[in-house]
Amino acid sequence: MVIKQDKGCLEFGKEIIVAGVLNVTPDSFYDGGKNNDLDSALNHARRMIEDGADIIDIGGESTRPDSSYVSADEEKLRVIPVIKELSKETHIPISIDTYKAEVAEEAIKAGAQIINDISGLQADDEMARVAAENNTPIIIMHIKGHPHDFPKDPVYDNLIPEIISFFERRIEYAVNSGIAHNNIIIDPGIGFGKKPEHNLAILRQLNDFKCLNLPIMVGTSRKSFISKVLELSDEQNLPKSDSRLAGTLVTLIIAVIKGANIVRVHDVRETIQAIKMYRAIESAKCKEKT
């Protein structure tokens, strides 16, 4: 599958696409406050591109548990200047991480080429129109609850079939709204209304989502379920601590093995190194003496 864009093509199936996360927020769980000013944000984006990022995913509102709602106007103030400047200097596609149609529309005008909607086209009725009218690829994520209102004790009768059914409904809605089927990417939403055991099961059964015949994005980077699984201490349990990096890399390699096409990460260089090592092992051949 190929998604054509003004700045080139994203081709799925041959290589894993690495999306580097750029949060221009004061309160994101990992990098909140690091990239609040334009120069810091641009410098971080440049570092990720230098490290090999294929996409820069820019977000202006934290969606971690208990995060605060941000108005569309405030969100635009955070992301639009970064998108405008970054799009002038790089051929790398820019993704806008938002569930607000107004923000997405302005971001596309500023140079963004992909919409990453964590609400799965549920939070804003206008989002599908924006994607359709601009012929913009869109990432539809599964979420149980609302971006700022996850259930504290989520329950699934049959986890994977329920998520697949969700995607079937949202894909049908997207296509009926004018979004081209080949402009849709799915994301099972690790950590969004899921317990640690749900996240682990999704990774183990990620291949099951291939029945939808769409590219799959996975984001596990430094999420709290890693700390819970690894039983990290309070100090180690901080997402800014490197203690979550090892667990992150393992989950990402499992995702790649199980069929992920895109991985959304904070640590671009380390992720690419891990994928390269996995690929080397997978393709290794040793000639035996005869």
Residue ranges of predicted features:
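Conserved hydrophobic/aromatic pocket- or pore-lining residues that grip, position, or stack substrates
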Residues: 22, 52, 115
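Active-site-adjacent loop and "lid" segments of alpha/beta metabolic enzymes
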Residues: 5-6, 30-39, 43-44, 63-85, ...
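Short strand-loop junctions, especially beta-strand C-caps/beta-turns
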Residues: 27, 189-191
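N-terminal amphipathic alpha-helix/helix-capping segment at the start of soluble metabolic enzymes
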Residues: 1-25, 172-179, 284-287
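Active-site loop-to-helix "anion-binding N-cap" substructures in soluble metabolic enzymes
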Residues: 3, 53-55, 170
